[in-house]
From Swiss-Prot:
It comes from Cytophaga hutchinsonii (strain ATCC 33406 / DSM 1761 / CIP 103989 / NBRC 15051 / NCIMB 9469 / D465). Keywords: Ribonucleoprotein, Ribosomal protein. HAMAP family: Ribosomal_bL17 (MF_01368). GO terms for cellular component: cytosolic large ribosomal subunit. The keyword Ribosomal protein applies. SUPFAM superfamilies: Prokaryotic ribosomal protein L17. This is Large ribosomal subunit protein bL17. Disulfide bonds: none annotated.
Length: 156
């Protein structure tokens, strides 16, 4: 019986799945954004977010624990030196999954999983939208403006 076993096995053995998630987590930390299938991205999110939370406490024990999951010195160094500084104030939700449609060969649902604070396009768009907001004028003000611009005076 599989009561309470809600992890997606991704059609792999336990060791193959651990290696897959470890490699994908290292790639995500190093490149900040990777393209993959939706089920893999959802499993990767469950795998990498606790590692990022653990990296906030920069201690020897947390470094060794994260290294036991990632097994890549470069990605551990990147995580503790650069990524944690940027997400220090965030209480969780360090990754974002953006669906990109179906893959051409086998129609698999594809997506992009990325670290939230590293996407500059969303940050710039939100700042521009805040600056571009204007108040709306009433229709009466528009009628007054149009009558003044034509030179016609309203009759009393």
């Amino acid at each position: 019986m599989r009561h309470g076993k809600k992890d997606n096995h991704l059609g792999r053995t336990v060791t193959h799945r651990r290696a897959l998630l470890s490699n994908m987590a290292s790639s995500l930390i190093l490149h900040k954004r990777i393209s993959t299938t939706v089920p893999k991205a959802k499993e990767l999110r469950k795998y990498v977010e606790p590692l990022i939370t653990k990296a906030k406490a920069d201690s020897t024990h947390s470094r060794r624990t994260v290294f036991s999951y990632l097994q890549n010195k470069d990605s551990v160094k990147e995580l503790f030196d650069n990524v944690v500084e940027k997400i220090a104030a965030r209480p969780g939700g360090y990754t974002r999954i953006l669906k990109t449609g179906a893959r051409i060969g086998d129609n698999a649902d594809m997506c992009i999983i990325e670290l939230v604070d590293y996407n500059e396009t969303y940050v710039k768009d939100s700042e521009v939208k805040v600056a571009a907001k204007r108040t709306r004028r009433s229709t009466a003000a528009k009628k007054d403006d149009s009558s003044e611009s034509t030179g016609a005076e309203p009759q009393a």
